């Protein structure tokens, strides 16, 4: 439910709407969403991608961009719905392939026009996913990106 609450907030739902949906107080919603953003004590893991099918969490991907490492957790036994299928310990190359698989092809006709419409200066799968939530025509899977507030405490002087 924590991921669903964070996803609803990202989709523009108000805290009050989310609270009504889950029949909890607004304070509970605030606390749960804050919890969703505190997913790692590792200061190098600043981003988590939640790969969902509709509203069902399928895979979480904790990302360490500095050391080019990822750690995943699958939440479904349905292999086609997992971010990396049967691969239990994906590499950085697997991760970059996954990102590219959730975007339009780099070689697509009028790619520059599409990027311009998106407000992006160049083709970068991560930036595209931040704009599109990794949604693709023909499937109902998408990506929720969470930034780790816990990791920022060590670097944020405020």
Model-derived features with residue positions:
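Short coil turns linking two alpha-helices in DNA-binding domains
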Residues: 25-27
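Short alpha-helical "recognition helix" segments of helix-turn-helix
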Residues: 17-22
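Short, amphipathic alpha-helical "recognition" segments used to contact nucleic acids or chromatin
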Residues: 1-13
